[in-house]
Design a protein with these regions (language model features):
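Glycine-rich, aromatic-flanked loop segments that form ligand/cofactor-binding clefts
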Residues: 99, 105-141
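Conserved, mostly hydrophobic/aromatic
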Residues: 3, 35, 104, 117, ...
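Metal- or metallocofactor-binding catalytic centers and their adjacent structured scaffolds
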Residues: 32, 36-115, 391
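Structured beta-strand/loop patches that form or line metal/cofactor-binding pockets in enzymes
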Residues: 1-50, 331-339, 391-392
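Extended hydrophobic packing segments that form well-structured cores
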Residues: 360-392
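Shared catalytic-loop signature of beta/alpha-barrel
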Residues: 214, 220, 231-250, 254-351, ...
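Metal-dependent enolase-superfamily TIM-barrel catalytic cores that perform enediolate-based chemistry
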Residues: 130-238, 243
Length: 392
């Protein structure tokens, strides 16, 4: 199957705010090959990612992603990996390339699965898919009372695990954060799994992060996610060396396999979180999942946007029965909610399951998302390199 066309669609809510909510805009990718159409989603700035696909070549190691993709054959998983390797070489100085390629790569897996009549996870070598325990992924409220109500709501909906992140954490004093953690625990109940995400707020300040450990332990948190910058491996290792009962989590900032492995080997995290929309797609995420198994680290998806992205993020570890928890975007913006025609919902036991339909198993509702489409055009020296294509 030859890659005939790659289309990018920049979607956005009418108003974008400064809250740490990545579902306010989206970049969908539609790929046509061999009579099949596949969809993917980049977890990145839409306009910058489109530019990385079409930009003029700067030199031999800084080429647009487009040059390595269009016209290529995609008849096997090995072909997808081969294209990814070419991009790593030809676009090594184009730092946005991995994010752009991520969405294209997902779409290629979607196409390959549809062509073979199998879900992506089977193409990755899994015989069966294991159910995952979804944790409702939420932002902290502006105050503990607001946080309490948010967590109570998801508990009432049947979720036994919840993650609270960003918001005011790390911006005030230790007591302020302790009150937020306690509110999360109160809302979830004694038996729920509480996860805390600091959103990299402490940079590489180990002492500031460590000052929160007693409060996290008191709240019974399972992990402390991204206390530091995504590449501050020494800071992660220093905090892990204090042997807290709470394990560290990180890895969503990895935009290649090497960064993810470094987080495991040098950052000493107990949970490695990979975003297929950033790392280069499903293939590199599967490599990290296998590496995590070998290193005794728990693999977890990172997804805070649509259920198209959720399906893609589940594929790399679908068959890993011992890696049971899954990030579940609980309160995304309307844009993200409307991308998928059929959302991935918990079953009667509270588990979610990766789709078993061919490809990613998620149909994109082009009519529903048309109202979010942002018309964009990139013109260089009088030549149009990109113009928003038609959705249907």
């Amino acid at each position: 199957m030859k890659i005939d066309a790659v289309d990018f669609f920049y979607l956005a809510m009418p108003q974008i705010t400064t809250e740490g909510d990545g579902s306010q805009d989206a970049l969908l990718v539609r790929v046509a090959a061999g009579g099949q159409v596949g969809w993917g989603e980049c977890e990145a700035s839409p306009l910058v990612s489109i530019a990385a696909y079409v930009c003029p070549m700067s030199h031999g190691a800084c080429r647009p992603v487009k040059d390595s993709v269009e016209g290529q054959n995609v008849d096997s998983p090995a072909e997808i990996a081969r294209i990814g390797a070419v991009i790593q070489w030809d676009s090594m100085d184009l730092l946005q390339a991995a994010h752009t390629w991520s969405g294209v790569e997902m779409a290629l897996w979607d196409i390959l699965g549809k062509a073979r009549g199998e879900p992506v996870w089977k193409l990755l070598g899994y015989k069966k898919a294991a159910g995952k325990v979804p944790y409702a992924s939420l932002l902290f409220g502006d105050n503990p009372d607001e946080t309490l109500e948010r967590v109570k709501t998801v508990r009432q909906k049947g979720f036994t695990a919840a993650k609270l992140g960003w918001g005011p954490i790390g911006r005030g004093n230790v007591k302020d954060d302790a009150d937020q953690f306690a509110a999360g625990r109160e809302g979830l109940g004694k038996d729920g799994m509480l996860l805390i995400d600091a959103g990299q707020i402490f940079g590489e300040n180990v002492e500031s992060a460590a000052a929160r450990l007693p409060a996290l332990q008191s709240a019974g948190a399972t992990w402390f996610e991204e206390p530091f910058h995504g590449s501050a491996y020494e800071a992660y290792a220093a905090l892990a060396a204090r042997k807290p009962s709470i394990r560290l989590a990180g890895g969503e900032a990895a935009h290649n396999v090497f960064m993810a492995k470094h987080m495991i080997d040098y950052g000493k995290v107990g949970f490695i979180q990979i975003d297929c929309g950033r790392i280069g797609g499903i293939s590199p995420a599967k490599i990290v999942a296998d590496y995590a198994v070998a290193k005794g680290v728990t693999y977890v998806n990172h997804t805070f946007t649509s259920h198209l992205a959720l399906s893609a993020s589940l594929q790399p570890y679908a068959g890993l029965a011992d890696h049971r928890i899954c990030e579940y975007p609980m309160a995304p913006k309307a844009l993200a909610r409307e991308i998928a025609r059929t959302p991935i919902l918990p079953d009667r036991e509270g588990l979610i399951h990766v789709p078993d339909a061919p490809g990613l198993g998620v149909a994109v509702d082009t009519k529903a998302i048309a109202k979010y489409l942002v018309e964009a055009e990139i013109v260089v020296a009088g030549r149009t390199l990109y113009k928003t294509p038609k959705l249907a």
